[in-house]
């Protein structure tokens, strides 16, 4: 038996935790008037097979079948996670419709509905601070820390996951491409 730990005192490594799923989208067969013009794989069978293949290797994704055989609910870690899957499938020749992203709510032990929260860190030039703060204020973000670094500010927020949906585009516009934004799951 081979191991990477000391043979006399083997210690178990802590498992890697996977962040909670925060967004879901409905993936369905394209039934628009332009269906069948852009993709090679257009049927629900093709879509189903590809999505089930994806969840075998993508451990941070969940798939649910719906009442309709043509639609599937795909849950993932966030916008980027789901958009990478969509773009990969598009490049592989799949043609599909995608629904609006929805935040996955959670019930605590008392039955109270809770919303996923994200810890957001932003590095932005000082002259764009006002526009960024205004945009985040409208999205219910709460400033927890601000640090000055040369001509940049680092701002840390706690924000509902729904507040981050399509925020990246606004952020890049507000900072003229000079801002850096990172977020991780913070809890419910």
Label the predicted regions:
Residues 1-188:
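Accessory interaction regions appended to the cores of large information-processing enzymes
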């Amino acid at each position: 038996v081979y191991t990477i730990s000391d043979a006399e005192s083997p210690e178990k490594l802590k498992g890697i935790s996977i962040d909670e799923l925060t967004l879901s989208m409905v993936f369905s067969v394209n039934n628009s008037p332009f269906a069948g013009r852009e993709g090679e794989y257009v049927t629900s069978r093709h879509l189903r097979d590809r999505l089930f293949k994806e969840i075998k290797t993508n451990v941070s994704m969940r798939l649910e079948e719906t009442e309709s055989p043509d639609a599937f609910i795909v849950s993932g870690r966030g916008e980027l996670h789901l958009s990478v899957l969509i773009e990969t499938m598009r490049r592989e020749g799949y043609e599909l419709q995608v629904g609006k992203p929805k935040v996955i709510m959670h019930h605590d032990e008392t039955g109270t509905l809770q919303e996923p929260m994200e810890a957001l860190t932003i590095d932005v030039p000082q002259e764009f601070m006002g526009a960024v703060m205004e945009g985040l204020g409208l999205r219910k973000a709460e400033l927890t820390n601000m640090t000055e670094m040369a001509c940049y500010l680092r701002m840390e927020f706690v924000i509902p996951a729904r507040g981050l949906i399509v925020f990246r585009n606004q952020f890049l516009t507000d900072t003229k491409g000079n801002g850096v934004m990172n977020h991780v799951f913070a809890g419910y």
